């Protein structure tokens, strides 16, 4: 089974990628920075760029995507000057990945180490 893991520059994505490799799975890791300390093949990817997401996932052609990338500085995420960027990454980036997975009939798992809303709220940021 082949995986594409986002957010391998962070703690969760890094650990997920290492565990997959340890278990003998094939995988490609991604994150925003140009290079990342990982034993897996790596590609730099801005998940807010819909076209780049489609190209990356299509080129890798994974059986599943494990989406760990996110804006994780929770306190800074609530600052007015960061709201648009946080939404672009955490909502828009996730949508980009989900849309490509749907198009390619590729499974997607979204996991987080921090705040995840239950989806029952009526407005963003007021879950």
Predicted segments with their positions:
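Conserved glycine-rich Rossmann-like NAD(P)H-binding loop of the short-chain dehydrogenase/reductase
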Residues: 21-36
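Rossmann-fold cofactor-recognition segment
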Residues: 33-50
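NAD(P)H-binding glycine-rich loop region in Rossmannoid oxidoreductase-like domains
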Residues: 47-89
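Helix C-cap/helix->beta junction micro-motif
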Residues: 23, 60, 100-104
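Conserved internal alpha-helix in NAD(P)-dependent oxidoreductase domains
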Residues: 84, 88-95, 103
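Conserved Rossmann-fold NAD(P)-dependent oxidoreductase catalytic core, especially the SDR/UDP-sugar
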Residues: 95-127
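N-terminal Rossmann NAD(P)H-binding glycine-rich loop of SDR-like oxidoreductase domains
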Residues: 1-23
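SDR active-site strand-loop-helix element
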Residues: 6, 30, 65-69, 108-113
């Amino acid at each position: 089974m082949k995986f594409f893991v986002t957010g391998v520059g962070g703690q969760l994505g890094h650990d997920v990628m290492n565990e997959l490799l340890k278990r003998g799975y094939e995988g490609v890791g991604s994150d925003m920075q140009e290079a990342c300390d990982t034993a897996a093949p790596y590609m730099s990817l801005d998940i807010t760029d819909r076209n780049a997401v489609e190209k990356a996932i299509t080129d890798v052609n994974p059986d599943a995507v494990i989406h760990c990338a996110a804006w994780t500085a929770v306190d800074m995420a609530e600052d007015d000057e960061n709201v648009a960027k946080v939404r672009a990454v955490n909502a828009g980036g996730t949508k980009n990945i989900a849309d490509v997975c749907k198009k390619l009939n590729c499974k997607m798992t979204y996991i987080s180490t921090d705040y995840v809303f239950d989806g029952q709220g009526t407005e963003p940021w007021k879950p």
